[in-house]
Amino acid sequence: MAQFPEKANVVIIGLGGIVGSSVMHHLVESGWDDIVGIDKTSVPTDIGSTSHASDFCYATDHSKFVCYTTGYSIDFFDKMGHYSRIGGLEVARVGDDDRMMELKRKVASGKAFGTNVKMISAAEAKALFPLLEEDMIQGAMWDPDAGLVKPRSQTVAGILVDNAVKTGQAQSWANTNAIGLDIKDGRIVGVDTSRGYIAAEHVI
């Protein structure tokens, strides 16, 4: 078995989820090397948020940052061949005018931030999702770019890590707990792990 490294340019704590694996992928893609990713469980993780996430991506939000990052993620997964752009509906029941107003505000925010979201009628919502009872809703928000990561974001996380490791620029260490951070002069200079200490120029 390979020896756990004593130093690295970058240490990623929490490699097994979609965020940690994406960080490794993007660092490698940007030319970084000597990257060590660790996770306290398997890679991809079987206990983290990614392992039980819905895998549904919805780009429409009141936050410009959320709209941008989710839109980026959708395009990223799509280019990998791991996205199903099935669209997403949010409905407002008859009599719930506050909900209807909130959906309209959300659509306004989404349009301002570049998404393809729009308001649709109850009949249009019914046509998209026949199980809806048309007379019970007054309208809906429709985002045609919403969809599902396939087969799972957990699977994609594993693919991203595997591809990064194959370049020789990164290492993946599963079942490796981060026990503590070594901080000197306000800067993290290393990580104590269950496999030993690793010095690092950068810790994520």
Task: Write out the residue ranges for each language-model feature.
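Helical element adjacent to the flavin cofactor pocket in flavoenzyme catalytic cores
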Residues: 142-202
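A short, glycine/Asx- and small/polar-enriched loop/turn
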Residues: 129-137, 182-189
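Glycine-rich FAD pyrophosphate-binding loop
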Residues: 28-49
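Dinucleotide-binding Rossmann-like beta1-alpha1 core, especially the glycine-rich loop
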Residues: 53-129, 138
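Short, flexible hinge/linker loops that cap or flank conserved catalytic cores
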Residues: 2-5, 29, 197
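Beta1/beta-strand and adjacent pyrophosphate-binding region of the FAD-binding site
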Residues: 2-19, 36
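Gly/Ala-rich phosphate-binding loop of Rossmann-like dinucleotide-binding domains
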Residues: 24, 28-29, 163
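Short beta-to-alpha linker loops that shape the active-site pocket of alpha/beta-hydrolase fold enzymes
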Residues: 41-43, 125, 160
